[in-house]
């Protein structure tokens, strides 16, 4: 996950009192080193979790990348390209909105609901798995079947046993909300941001 998302952007945060990423700061690193070869040391579940962030980037900002992921015969062999394209998207967004006042909010696609799932799951699910699940209710109904196919291809979950009531307390404490309002990003079609 960190190779395609949190490694750049300068946003740091910690969980507190069961709420995901509630305390944080913005500070740009001097350098970021990314080596896709290190991914060979990870179990497949971790690779899948990282791919969720690339699917997020593709859905919001690069329809061609989504096609590439969807058509790929071997996602593992395609990881260097998928990582590079995901990082380019993130870099472009962060450069335009370094402090998350506008466009950068698109990077939160899947994260509002995903963080609620992650907090309520109590560590049973990886961050990327929760982001994958969080994207599903936030995309247009016509896009959802395609997203389900892509997530399954990436080895990610597409269903979870929970209730809206179980997630609401976590949604209300999401750092992106203002007052009682919950702020979430919706995607109508791939690459629309």
Predicted stretch roles:
Residues 1-71:
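A glycine/threonine-rich phosphate-anchoring loop and its flanking beta-alpha core
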Residues 18, 118-119, 170-171:
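Glycine-rich, charged/polar anion/phosphate-binding loops
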Residues 31, 63, 74, 91, ...:
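Generic structural signal for secondary-structure transition and capping sites
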Residues 46, 52-54, 143-193:
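C-terminal charged capping/lid subdomain of soluble metabolic enzymes
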Residues 68-166:
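Active-site segments that bind and position negatively charged phosphate/pyrophosphate groups
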């Amino acid at each position: 996950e960190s190779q395609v998302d949190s490694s750049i952007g300068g946003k740091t945060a910690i969980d507190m009192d069961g709420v995901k990423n509630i305390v944080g700061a913005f500070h740009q690193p001097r350098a970021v080193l990314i080596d896709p070869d290190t991914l060979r040391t990870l179990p497949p579940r971790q690779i899948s979790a990282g791919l969720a962030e690339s699917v997020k980037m593709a859905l919001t900002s690069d329809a061609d990348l989504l096609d590439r992921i969807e058509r790929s015969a071997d996602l593992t062999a395609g990881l260097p390209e998928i990582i590079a394209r995901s990082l380019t998207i993130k870099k472009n967004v962060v450069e335009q909105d370094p402090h998350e006042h506008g466009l950068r909010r698109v990077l939160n696609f899947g994260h509002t609901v995903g963080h609620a799932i992650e907090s309520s799951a109590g560590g049973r699910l990886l961050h990327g798995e929760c982001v994958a699940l969080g994207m599903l209710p936030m995309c247009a109904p016509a896009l959802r079947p395609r997203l389900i196919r892509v997530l399954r291809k990436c080895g990610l979950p597409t269903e979870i046993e929970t209730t809206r009531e179980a997630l609401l307390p976590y949604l209300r404490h999401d750092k992106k909300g203002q007052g009682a309002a919950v702020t979430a990003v919706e995607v109508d079609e791939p690459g629309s941001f």
